[in-house]
């Protein structure tokens, strides 16, 4: 488990960097940046932004498979550059306290997450992302922050997963935002709680990413009847059909590796 971001800053519960990594039936408990799916991006945005065990190592992308896991956190609690397939996992967003929100004002140049000090996307009312006839609460968090390298075929795929929260208000959590401009995050047949923002994903206040990220969903369904309509998704989020969703089948994503047969 990693500590409260208000008192401990970034505290990674699992640093996963390598190929053919399988995590089965594990609980990863944290707040900010709970699970790092390495490798690191090629370059940091701030000088000295990467301080970690493999900061000078070659960036070699690997495949990671998470099955029947429980992962919790608040800000970007799944982040990194790996090709990672999540199946039958539960992702719980935690309510951030006032103290936790203030912790984002502290520079994170001594951490892996070199853009964590950008709070503009955290503290706004989020009305800029979806212009509708309802008011949404302040943002509580983001589930993912992928840094998929340009040209990499796959990023994060969540299949038959549950996105839940016990305490976050409706519409206060985004499914993800791009740590790097070519972030890829796809949801296939996932259950979404009312805490998920109707826009789905955020652009981290970088409109240029609308043409470079790949955010997509297929057959997402609400956990409760008070969930905002999926038709309110941001313009840069794609709604896949069945044929398109087939491109993200586990066998294709993981290639010649079949962890279920081990």
What does each model-found stretch correspond to?
Residues 1-114, 122-262:
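Sequence-level preference for short, compositionally simple segments enriched
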